[in-house]
UniProtKB/Swiss-Prot annotation:
Its EC number is 2.7.8.1, 2.7.8.2, 2.7.8.22. The active site is at H155 (proton acceptor). It is a multi-pass membrane protein. GO terms for molecular function: 1-alkenyl-2-acylglycerol choline phosphotransferase activity; diacylglycerol cholinephosphotransferase activity; ethanolaminephosphotransferase activity; metal ion binding; phosphotransferase activity, for other substituted phosphate groups. Glycans are attached at N144. This is Choline/ethanolaminephosphotransferase 1. The modification Phosphoserine is found at S18. Keywords: Endoplasmic reticulum, Glycoprotein, Lipid biosynthesis, Lipid metabolism, Magnesium, Manganese, Membrane, Metal-binding, Nucleus, Phospholipid biosynthesis, Phospholipid metabolism, Phosphoprotein, Transferase, Transmembrane, Transmembrane helix. InterPro entries: CDP-OH_P_trans, CDP-OH_PTrfase_TM_dom, CDP_ALCOHOL_P_TRANSF_CS, CHOPT. The gene is Cept1.
Length: 416
């Protein structure tokens, strides 16, 4: 079964590609399914075939992972066996996003002071996401429901969470008063996540460093709690020896982390891939993925610096979310390319949102840049969701599984 057949089913028929795996769809459900599903399946038959052969490979462990394993094992033991791993992941992501949106609501320019409970909620939301994200794979193995879809879903949620986590951190330390630093921190976060999967696309193995996601998440949780304890005076206070504001300390940590991580990533990338003649796992150039993330960052910098109305300075959260959704989509496409051993194509609807902003500036802001930013934000979010829903549904249909439900017997079982 290639996954192509079920996209032609009539509304009301049994629909194996339904995101939640329900058998019967109402008229409203059918309309939503068409709205959030691409007209043609995103993956070819050859890609689906190679996806079946994919096996998850990882190497290394971070500093806190051995210490957290006991807690994670205890936590997964409390989860009912009928709860699907992907459901655990999406619940954690939803909580993480909702708590960050609270901060965005109260601090749209990342310079305001939010209610103390909003910072506590954001810290708790991130801890919940970190916990649930860590146990989804354990739940998959525990219920014998591991699949390539689970791995893709996990990385896809992480790509979106990264955007909200770095944005929430910038808001917590009120980094909007230093727009250049805020811009750097947010894009450095998404760039590092992309590079992690870039080196996986090259080497075939996802590598974890001594300081990795878990450590960064714990550090960010501490930042939110410090915002509760110290408030604005704490972040505005000066660090004695360095003679800089305290709020720049997380930014300097981001610089150090970016240098450290990217050094390791590019060492793997430039060493050569596992493909023919040192190419990627798909047999393509090891440098080819740079075109995608490079295009996103270049457009983001140009639009930021050329704006006549200080678009980023006045609306940093909307700006970061817009380009964050674009980055999340191309990261997801990179993960799919790795798992299906296929080439990444540069032409993508993800670039339409940034292109609208660029063209509007080129024609001397024929339309208010703020309005175009909202259009780009909505389009980029819709484009991301549409792609993710389509890919997940097609893979679920092909593997004869459900996205958010565990089947009694699982036909395909890989490492999650």
């Amino acid at each position: 079964m290639s996954g192509h057949r079920s996209t032609r089913k009539r509304c009301g028929d049994s629909h194996p590609e339904s995101p939640v795996g329900f058998g019967h769809m109402s008229t409203t459900g059918c309309i939503l399914n068409k709205l959030f599903q691409l007209p043609t399946p995103p993956l070819s038959r050859h890609q689906l075939k190679r996806l079946e052969e994919h096996r998850y490979q990882s190497a290394g462990r971070s500093l806190l992972e051995p210490l957290m394993q006991g807690y994670w094992e205890w936590l997964v033991g409390r989860v009912p066996s009928w709860i699907a791993p992907n459901l655990i992941t999406i619940i954690g992501l939803s909580i993480n996003i909702c708590t960050t949106i609270l901060l965005v609501f109260y601090c749209p320019t990342a310079t305001e002071q939010a209610p103390l409970w909003a910072y506590i909620a954001c810290a708790c939301g991130l801890f919940i996401y970190q916990s649930l994200d860590a146990i989804d794979g354990k739940q998959a193995r525990r219920t014998n429901s591991s699949s390539p879809l689970g791995e893709l879903f996990d990385h896809g949620c992480d790509s979106l969470s990264t955007v909200f986590v770095v944005l929430g951190t910038c808001i917590a330390v009120q980094l909007g008063t230093n727009p250049d630093w805020m811009f750097f921190c947010c894009f450095a976060g998404t760039f590092m996540f992309y590079c992690a999967h870039w080196q996986t696309y090259v080497s075939g193995t996802l590598r974890f460093g001594i300081i990795d996601v878990t450590e960064v998440q714990i550090f960010i949780i501490i930042m939110h709690l410090l915002a509760v304890i110290g408030g604005p005076p704490f972040w505005q206070s000066m660090i004695p020896v360095l003679n800089i504001q305290m709020k720049l300390f997380p930014a300097l940590c981001t610089v150090a982390g970016t240098i450290f991580s990217c050094t390791n990533y590019f060492r793997v990338i430039f060493t050569g891939g596992v493909g023919k003649n040192g190419s990627t796992i798909a047999g393509t150039s090891v440098l080819s993925p740079f075109l995608h993330i490079g295009s996103v960052i270049t457009l983001a910098v140009m639009i930021y610096k050329k704006s006549a109305v200080q678009l980023f300075e006045k609306h940093p959260c909307l700006y970061i979310l817009t380009f964050g959704f674009v980055s999340a989509k191309i990261t997801n496409k990179l993960v799919v390319a790795h798992m299906t051993k296929s080439e990444m194509h540069l032409h993508d609807t993800a670039f339409i949102g940034p292109a609208l902003l660029f063209l509007d500036q080129y024609f001397n802001s024929f339309i208010d840049e703020y309005i175009v930013l909202w259009i780009a934000l909505v389009f980029s979010f819709f484009d991301l969701i549409r792609y993710c829903v389509s890919v997940c549904n097609q893979i679920a249909s092909h593997l004869h599984i459900h996205v958010f439900r565990i089947k009694t017997s699982t036909a395909h079982s890989n490492h999650h």
